[in-house]
């Protein structure tokens, strides 16, 4: 564990001591080495925890998300280099420091064995993300987006703190290893109902559940490219990971309380997918697409057949992080660096001008619509099977959601790549090796995940 934490921590002094000429190449190379080192976590075949100590441990649930977190830092640095090239060097160093601090917080959150440590790291991720959005966002609306992000997250998280303190007063521990050994039968009282709701509310807001999702489109649209990538790839998945972890403390006798969340998440898949079909803003469409996919993960987390549903949630969490991060990069290269507009109608027919970029769009959209045998398809079909076993009526909503997902994914591709090129796009800059390298590093990991999906399906299969 220290092989990853200490080099990541040393990136902060390296950021401030490296010569400005070598700042971006040096930090990108170091972070890439750290991400390659993190792959060693895949090669532990133990079904229990490993690299363990009193406060932090790694198991098959946290391993995929930890590796995804480490893999994302060099990608964010590559994506942000051109965007920040005109900034003063001190601001560039501050930006990189925020990204490194965010990665450290996420690593500690995903590996925490104490629930209070997990809560602290869960909240600390808010600080660098908020700074990135409000300082390096592109428009004045970024301040409004930051306010939404701050208050939604805090309003959902404070009840979780009260619930954890209540759990500690009744059990005497917040260690996940010890909580698994306690009897999980809890009396059906209104106080315990409230405790159960408080445990899940923070993660529902973070994912987000339909109805608590209004902060995400604003934050996603106004954030710079690195902020959009980390939101889509990691921070939303932190909510799904929290649901999986906290579920061991929740009583099965309260399964009726999960029904409203489950129904609302399935209904949210339909609603957000329908909203995507009516969007004219490219980044907003990608944000609502994230909400739609997270609806399936929420329904899996609240399902009573964990052996299948949680496996699907783990697969979809990881693969969706890569796919949506890739879509954010493509939107950035198209919207901000070439057409200077997020409007779909003003950026049509780019496939004839940038054919290789059109190929990346096609692959990313096919992965987003869960085309077999992509990992997204494996996750979705596993969750849909588990939901069908729980109630056959859910197949109506999940099938309709799948149809709408395919529809808006194809709509996104056709609106950006096909048709007549607008007359104002008469001087488009060619693509660069940096951009193709970034897209390759996003989409190449999908291939081994297709060939060996057990790497990311956790302990539940």
Swiss-Prot record:
Keywords annotated in UniProt: Electron transport, Membrane, Mitochondrion, NAD, Respiratory chain, Translocase, Transmembrane, Transmembrane helix, Transport, Ubiquinone
Cellular component annotations (GO), alphabetically ordered: mitochondrial membrane; respiratory chain complex I
Lipid bilayer topology: Multi-pass membrane protein
Catalysed reactions listed for this entry: a ubiquinone + NADH + 5 H(+)(in) = a ubiquinol + NAD(+) + 4 H(+)(out)
TM stretches of this protein: 23-43, 58-78, 92-112, 113-133, 148-168, 196-216, 224-244, 257-277, 353-373, 395-415
Subcellular locations according to the entry: Mitochondrion membrane
UniProt-listed InterPro entries: NADH4_N, NADH_Q_OxRdtase_chainM/4, NADH_UbQ_OxRdtase, ND/Mrp_TM
Presence of the UniProt keyword Cytoplasm in the record: no
EC number: 7.1.1.2
GO BP: aerobic respiration; ATP synthesis coupled electron transport; electron transport coupled proton transport
Main localization (coarse): mitochondrion
Matches recorded under Pfam families: Oxidored_q5_N (PF01059), Proton_antipo_M (PF00361)
MF (Gene Ontology): NADH dehydrogenase (ubiquinone) activity; ubiquinone binding
Job of this protein: Core subunit of the mitochondrial membrane respiratory chain NADH dehydrogenase (Complex I) that is believed to belong to the minimal assembly required for catalysis. Complex I functions in the transfer of electrons from NADH to the respiratory chain. The immediate electron acceptor for the enzyme is believed to be ubiquinone.
Similarity remark: Belongs to the complex I subunit 4 family.
UniProt name for this protein: NADH-ubiquinone oxidoreductase chain 4
Record organism: Xenopus laevis
């Amino acid at each position: 564990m220290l092989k990853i934490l200490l080099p990541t921590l040393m990136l902060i002094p390296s950021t401030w001591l490296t010569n400005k000429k070598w700042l971006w190449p040096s930090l990108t190379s170091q972070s890439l080495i750290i991400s390659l080192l993190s792959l060693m976590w895949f090669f532990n075949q133990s079904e229990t925890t490993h690299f363990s100590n009193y406060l932090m441990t790694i198991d098959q649930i946290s391993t995929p998300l930890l590796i995804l977190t480490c893999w994302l830092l060099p990608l964010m640095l590559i994506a942000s280099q051109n965007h920040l090239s005109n900034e003063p060097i001190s601001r560039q160093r501050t930006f990189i420091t925020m990204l490194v601090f965010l990665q450290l917080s996420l690593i500690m959150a995903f590996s925490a064995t104490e629930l209070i440590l997990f809560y602290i790291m869960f909240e600390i991720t808010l600080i660098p993300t908020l700074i990135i959005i409000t300082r390096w966002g592109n428009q004045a609306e970024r301040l409004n987006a930051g306010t939404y992000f701050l208050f939604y997250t805090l309003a959902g998280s404070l009840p979780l703190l009260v619930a954890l303190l209540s759990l500690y007063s009744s059990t005497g521990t917040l260690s996940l290893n010890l909580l698994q050994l306690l009897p999980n039968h809890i009396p059906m009282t209104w106080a315990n109902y409230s405790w159960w709701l408080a445990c899940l509310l923070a993660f529902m807001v973070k994912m987000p559940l339909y109805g608590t999702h209004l902060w995400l489109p604003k934050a996603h649209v106004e954030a710079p490219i690195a902020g959009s990538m980390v939101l889509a790839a990691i921070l939303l998945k932190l909510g799904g990971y929290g649901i999986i972890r906290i579920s061991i403390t929740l009583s099965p006798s309260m399964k009726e309380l999960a029904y409203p969340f489950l129904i609302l998440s399935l209904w949210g898949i339909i609603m957000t997918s329908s909203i995507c079909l009516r969007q004219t803003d490219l980044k907003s469409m990608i944000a609502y697409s994230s909400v739609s996919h997270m609806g399936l993960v929420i329904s899996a987390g609240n399902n009573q057949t964990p052996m299948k549903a949680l496996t699907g949630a783990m697969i979809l969490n990881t693969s969706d992080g890569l796919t949506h991060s890739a879509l954010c990069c493509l939107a950035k290269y198209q919207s901000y660096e070439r057409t200077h507009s997020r409007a779909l109608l003003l950026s049509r027919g780019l496939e004839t001008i940038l054919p290789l970029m059109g190929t990346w769009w096609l692959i990313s959209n096919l992965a987003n619509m869960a085309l077999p045998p992509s990992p997204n398809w494996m996750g979705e079909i596993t969750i849909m099977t588990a939901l069908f076993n729980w109630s056959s009526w859910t197949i109506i909503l999940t099938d309709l959601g799948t149809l709408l997902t395919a529809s808006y994914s194809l709509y996104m591709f056709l609106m950006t790549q096909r048709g007549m090129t607008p007359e104002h796009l008469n001087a488009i800059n060619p693509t660069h090796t940096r951009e193709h390298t970034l897209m390759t590093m996003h989409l190449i990991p999908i291939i081994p995940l297709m060939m060996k999906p057990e790497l990311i399906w956790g302990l539940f299969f």
